[in-house]
């Protein structure tokens, strides 16, 4: 089956062609326009998706060496995300599905991040613990199989990627700051600042306190939002970045062994943009004795290959397929703890 995947949940537009799980083309267009604003502007994101989809679709079909008529299924990210951005993708998908007379399936963007690792590791062991870490999400799932996701825990405030971007801004790094902060942290002393990992009861996470601790480290007692940041040496910036990175990832890592045991998980699947962080990958391999599956770098960021892959799998299994594909900004998962 040849499946077209479409992704537009936030600020990256993507078109991909996947055939029976094999990626033939995966085109991604990032929106640099948001950098000057220090964050994603939803209206600008929607406009960029609208302008980019047609040319990106052409590039994907040419790269894969196929025509539109060869497409057998259209899979689109329809939740969760920015409602305007999702609507652009869903409407574009509906137009194609109607014109080509092809079936259309909606795919959960967060679930697709976890499925991305399964695409590259067909022998993934289940049940698995799924960890989705990105700019907008930090969630834990029990995965009895590759297409079932039961919520175990989530962040109670900021997502981990959002926290990275905010701390990067404190350090004067340009948006998006996550990768730049990781690069800065490589040259720093992770033990220079005693940022304590947040401890939240149960299976949830919290990152707001850690963000505030970094603010105090930079501003001292004058941590008012209006107070200017004092001059900080490059050495101190590197040390703060390294100490923050260690603490923020320990916030997650310290919970995993007990959760794996409680839910009898046989593997750990990690997905999302933050899953590309090399420090976190090393940390997980140190503390977890079970198999760990990460997507390749290209499949960590928002992309349509994961949308096409999961959509194709769901369609072939005839599971979780709704008759109407509707964009939805939020999604409520069934709990694994009920």
Curated annotation (Swiss-Prot):
Q: What class of enzyme is it?
A: transferase
User: Superkingdom of this entry's organism?
Assistant: Bacteria
Q: Which reaction does it catalyse?
A: L-threonylcarbamoyladenylate + adenosine(37) in tRNA = N(6)-L-threonylcarbamoyladenosine(37) in tRNA + AMP + H(+)
Q: Which InterPro entries match?
A: ATPase_NBD, Gcp-like_dom, KAE1/TsaD, Peptidase_M22_CS, TsaD
Co-factor requirement: Fe(2+)
Would you identify the family this protein belongs to, as annotated? Belongs to the KAE1 / TsaD family.
This chain belongs to the protein called: tRNA N6-adenosine threonylcarbamoyltransferase
């Amino acid at each position: 089956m040849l499946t077209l995947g479409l992704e537009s949940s936030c600020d990256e537009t993507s078109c991909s062609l996947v055939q029976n799980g094999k990626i033939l083309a995966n085109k991604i267009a990032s929106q640099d326009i948001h950098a000057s604003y220090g964050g994603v502007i939803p209206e600008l994101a929607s406009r960029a998706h609208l302008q980019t989809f047609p040319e990106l679709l052409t590039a994907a079909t040419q790269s894969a060496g196929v025509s539109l008529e060869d497409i057998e299924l259209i899979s689109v990210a329809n939740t969760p995300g920015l409602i305007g951005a999702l609507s652009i993708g869903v409407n574009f998908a509906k137009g194609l599905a109607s014109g080509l007379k092809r079936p259309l399936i909606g795919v959960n963007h967060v679930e697709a991040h976890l499925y991305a690792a399964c695409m590259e590791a067909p022998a993934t062991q289940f049940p698995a613990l799924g960890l989705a870490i990105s700019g907008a999400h930090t969630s834990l799932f029990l995965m009895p199989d590759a297409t079932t996701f039961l919520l175990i825990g989530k962040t109670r405030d900021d997502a981990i990627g959002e926290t990275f971007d905010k701390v990067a801004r404190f350090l004067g790094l340009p948006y998006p700051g996550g990768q730049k902060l990781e690069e800065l942290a490589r040259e720093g002393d992770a033990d220079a600042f005693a940022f304590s990992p947040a401890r939240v009861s149960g299976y949830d996470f919290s990152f707001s306190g850690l963000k505030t601790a970094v603010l105090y480290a930079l501003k001292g007692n004058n941590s008012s939002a209006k107070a200017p940041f004092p001059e900080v040496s490059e050495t101190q910036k590197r040390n703060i970045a390294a100490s923050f990175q260690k603490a923020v990832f320990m916030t997650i890592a310290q919970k995993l062994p007990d959760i794996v045991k409680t839910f009898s998980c046989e593997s750990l699947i990690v997905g999302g943009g933050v899953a590309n962080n090399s420090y976190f990958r090393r940390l997980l391999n140190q503390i977890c004795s079970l198999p760990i599956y990460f997507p390749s770098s290209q499949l960590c960021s928002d992309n349509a290959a994961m949308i096409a892959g999961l959509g194709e799998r769901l369609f072939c299994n005839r599971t979780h397929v709704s008759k109407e594909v509707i964009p939805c900004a939020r999604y409520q998962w069934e709990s694994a703890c009920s």
